[in-house]
Amino acid sequence: MIPEEIKNFLSHEGGSSLIIQGNPGSGKTILALELMDAFLDCNPMYLTTRLTTDAVYRYFPRLRQRQKEINVIESRDTFWDKFFAKADSNELRVERDAFEMYGMLDDPDRTDIAEFDRVCDRVDEFLPERSLLILDSIEGLCDKYKVSEKFFVGLINRCLIEPAHTKVVIVLEKMEKTEIDYLADGVISMHQMDRNGRRMRMLSIDKLRGIAINQPNYLFTLKNGRFRSFNAFKIMYPEEYLPFEPIPNTKTHYSTGNRDLDEIFGGYQIGSYILLETGENVDNFFYTLPMLTAANIVSQGGSAVILSVSGAGPSEVKNNVFEYGLSDRLNSFRVVTEENPEEPVTEDFVVAYDKERFASNSNILDLELAKLRAEQGGDVVKIVDYEILETMLDMQALKRTILSDKKYTAANKILTIAICKHSIAPEIKKTLANISDIHIRVNKYNDTMILYGEKPTTSVYVIEPDVGRGYEDVKLTLMR
């Protein structure tokens, strides 16, 4: 997916120039090729000094499949002795006399630019329709033609952009500001970033003349050799709700309830303690991850105990259960919540305790879990948000509770998912991280939600809502 702002920029009337700049390996060429693929109706041409045509097809096989639509032109050192008269000034045209001016320059080291004859012919043939020309890279072309980048961009503007309304994309192999940035109508920068040893990629829209920039920065991936950017995170709901599709557990592991998460972590081992740590400004949508695990276990005859918090209180859990088509299994859930005299408990799946009693008897969750297991049988998952426990217990009592939970989980061969939010004390975070079997981080970056494993270490994945199965799920895309 190409950012909407870039598509709008290349779709508006008239000619324009767009610079794609970035250090080597940042994905500039792949984006340029993706633009050609997206604008096949614009007579796309790819002028390159990097590779031969065969090499381009070898590295980007989809271009070979598009040979009729996309023309790959290699920059070679040949002579150009063919010039044409200027057409009527009111008509769209290729201004070839600009190249004639270049040919008259008294420079013994000059290289003739014969491949532009092919470019001009192709643009001419396509008029009055507009064409798209990719120059990859301008440094390579200018080095070959022995001209400055400023001169070359001016030449392209005089010859193709203004008179023929050609769209020209210029690949630039550097990040610092240059004089041609001011000549171009649009500039985008591509970045590779390191986050704790994990690679992330970001595209920044520096300017797009005449286009509103609603999202100036996009995370993107180059997975499978294709460019794909990610929009700001937005919750989605299915048009029609369908029953939850369980993923079978094994003798040794519980499924996470999500196929992508299972592929990354191999499921959750029976008796394991899972830490789900969230960063600042992460939406409550992240509760979908533990709720998928709970739905998967309950749908296979198990049960779930959940310590209620604002993001997953009794009403939210009930809504999830009904949306997953598990209304007949509602009593396989047990939501433990703080007693509220103004909202008396009327549901069998809700258990309310006053705060003082909870503080003096922190194993209430385990007692409820044992009751539920005796009633329902099967596997059990316990979901605990330590934000509420932190308000009830002092530091040392909370640490003892964490260690007790870890031992109880392993001894009783259940699954515990501990939720640790950004606001929790660093000492508690450290204790949870140390005793966890799997440690997953969920963060928000440029309004896009990401996930990665601290234990075991994984790459970064972008979290997107997925309602394709008829219920709230997530899709995880590797950032490569």
Predicted features along the sequence, with ranges:
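Phosphate-binding/switch region of NTP-binding enzymes
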Residues: 168-226, 413-480
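P-loop NTPase motor core
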Residues: 108-182, 187, 355-435
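A short acidic (Asp/Glu
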Residues: 56-58, 180-182, 286-288, 315-320, ...
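Glycine-rich P-loop/Walker A and Walker A-like loops and their local beta1-loop-alpha1 context
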Residues: 2-5, 12-51, 255-314
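Conserved inter-motif catalytic segment of the P-loop NTP-binding fold
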Residues: 42-141, 302-391
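Flexible glycine-/small-residue-rich
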Residues: 74-76, 207, 278, 385, ...
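C-terminal regions of RecA-like/P-loop NTPase motor modules
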Residues: 1-2, 214-300, 456-480
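Hydrophobic/aromatic beta-strand patches that form the interior of the parallel beta-sheet core
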Residues: 18-20, 45-47, 71-73, 169, ...
